[in-house]
């Protein structure tokens, strides 16, 4: 008999000892209202829980790069979302934010857990050409630029 698959949850991904457990919110509750517009309304209910990782890791790291959100999705995956200006001179900043979050999550994320999608959503006008060397840099870093809104197709 097969067990029903459980959705991925930020709560279940964090160790019991993690100091950031208390910051996890149901659904998109940890996502700032101004940033919810970057997630398509038709998929918002698919998120089990969320954490504002920018706030969670701010103390003592004011000058370090910080990725914005980690979301638990019903398709059994953890998804990192970064609303950020989409300019060519910001690509390295977004890549550095990913590297920083991976380090910041050390000791917080259970060993068997991993983030399956790293999504960059434009928080303003897109100022770099599609299919350019910049997208190659992002792809090599494991980050998908999704344009102005995270859609269902970005979650599969």
Task: Describe the residue ranges of each PLM region.
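Conserved catalytic cores of phosphodiester-cleaving nucleases, focusing on short active-site segments
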Residues: 69-71, 75-87
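Short, flexible loop/turn motifs enriched in small residues
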Residues: 62-66
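Acidic-basic catalytic patches of nuclease active cores, encompassing PD-(D/E)XK
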Residues: 1-61
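Conserved strand-to-helix beginnings and helix N-cap segments that scaffold or border functional pockets
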Residues: 91-95, 131-132
């Amino acid at each position: 008999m097969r067990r029903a698959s459980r959705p991925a949850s930020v709560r279940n991904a964090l160790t019991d000892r993690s100091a950031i457990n208390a910051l996890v919110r149901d659904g998109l509750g940890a996502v700032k209202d101004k940033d919810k517009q970057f997630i398509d309304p038709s998929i918002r209910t698919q998120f089990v829980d969320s954490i504002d990782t920018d706030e969670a890791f701010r103390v003592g790291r004011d000058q370090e790069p910080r990725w914005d959100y980690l979301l638990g999705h019903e398709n059994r995956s953890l998804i990192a979302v970064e609303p950020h200006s989409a300019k060519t001179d910001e690509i390295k900043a977004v890549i550095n934010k990913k590297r920083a979050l991976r380090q910041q999550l050390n000791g917080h994320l259970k060993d068997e857990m991993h983030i399956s999608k790293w999504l960059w959503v434009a928080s303003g006008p897109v100022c770099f050409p599609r299919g350019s060397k910049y997208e190659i840099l992002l792809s090599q870093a494991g980050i998908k630029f999704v344009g102005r809104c995270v859609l269902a197709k970005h979650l599969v």
